[in-house]
Amino acid sequence: MDKNATNYPLSVSMPQHCAYVVRDLPHATVEQRERALNATHWNEFAFPSGMLTVDMLSDSGTTAMTNQQWATLFLGDEAYGRNTGYYVLLDTFRDIFERGGEKNWKKVIDLVRTDCRDIEKMMDEVYLCEYEGGLFNGGAAQMERPNTFIIQQGRAAESVLMEIVKKILAARHPGKVFTIPSNGHFDTTEGNIKQMGSIPRNLYNKELLYEIPEGGSYEKNPFKGNMDIEKLEQLIQGVGPENVPLVFTCITNNPICGQPVSMANIREINRVAHKYDIPLVFDVARWAENCYFIKMNEEGYADKSIAEIASEMFSYCDVFTMSAKKDGHANMGGMLAFRDRGLFWQKFSDFNEDGTVKTDVGVLIKVKQISCYGNDSYGGMSGRDIMALACGLYESCDFGYMHDRVQQCEYLAQGFYKNGVKGVVLPAGGHAVYINMDEFFDGKRDHTTFAGTGFSLELIRRYGIRVSELGDFSMEYDLKTPEQQAELANVVRFAIDRSRLTKEHLDYVIAAVTELYKDRESIPNM
């Protein structure tokens, strides 16, 4: 035995957490589940969660929060105006997305957690701090030029953004139809774009997405969520830059099987968008997962922390919307922010002839936020949820936690693949495993059958496992143009809750899907 050794490696991973509370699962029968399916019109979203064995419908808001988060719930300030959590949350975002890594964090949340009674210190370090020029104005700048908006979830942030953009574009260009490209619009983003009368486009490499190397393993992640830069250039030139008001990037690329986006690709998207004077909008529900993939797979980032990578990544966007119910490691929360006096502000504000501001787009967004969701101090969130979110954002920067999470996804995907299930998208993303329904059914089900929905409902009926169909049915294949149909990934998603599922759950799902695959011919169409 080497007494001087400082490390004793094992062939298994070190546990990342332990359970404080457990919930017993129901034992519903096939007959009971079928009765419930009939009663809910065979709608996977309407099926009672209390009758499920494993619920993988979404990873949004389903997190098992940490003991630190539960503790901060008790520190929630429910004041209507400028609750303490407002200051803490905005500075948490500055810490992680702007300050370049842990060594530069202020972490003012610790002043609240330690019950700081020094009023002068709280005024100087929390309440009266002035910030401008970035994504999170503070103090007088946030009041004069609001650019940061707490909203209770991501789709609401998208809705506020797109409603204001729609209003501005309609006033300037009545009747004009715009095109908004992305590497992959999620269904809510696509819905919000359609509601503003614009055309959503998904520009990614579909052939690469479904490609699998022999043996099912890549040496390095190929970043299948990347935007196809050539297609982006062609689209902008084809429709004209004046007809593309925004370029979106989904990070990680949820509709395209949760695949990550490389930093090199993000830089290129930024370059192309700014070349044509178009603001770049990030949809960053899973920002931390994407930073993990960059760290593990992209040259030059191995020695950087998740927070350091996040600071660089966010430096390339003009606007971002976030559902913080994912990588906020929380059950509720969202954010909309744009760069102070940046390209989005310049393009969508109105100015007088002398250059002074006539209408500030941030003020329009703030009015919408307050009229629909509540005072800008809380944006529809409770004070306790704001504090839990601030704590959770730091939790998502922990490499050990994130590594464990991504490995859970890969374990599930490899379990399907090794059991011969066709259509598994590899490598797995950071939040879910996806199966290509076209390949699963051997190309025998056309797009009018909505077989992915049939698959998801049969999985509920037989085994009490709920997943999300994110293909032909939910993305409205039959209502799309031929171009849009070609861009659609006909998949179902097995979302993995944060810090909640065990290997036992995953093994049960692997066994169930394997058996269903063997009997796939009997799965009914919709």
What do these predicted regions represent?
Residues 46-67, 79-91, 477-480:
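A structural motif shared across PLP-dependent enzymes of the aminotransferase-like
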